[in-house]
Amino acid sequence: MGGAQAPEQVEEETAELKEAIAIGQAEQIEEEMGDLLFSLINYARFLQVDAEQALEKTNKKFMQRF
């Protein structure tokens, strides 16, 4: 998956996850969630964003709120 296609891939994987949720099959939901997470990490890489660092910052914000 190339970087230029990363935004479209995120949208596609999001749609597939929504479909899996609508069907209610746990294994398919897990698979599609994994695909979406991978796509998001690839998109971050394309944007030259450190996905791990971004997640750590968000976790810290979450912990401060609760």
Residue ranges and their predicted role:
Residues 1-33, 37-66:
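Flexible "arm" and connector segments at domain edges
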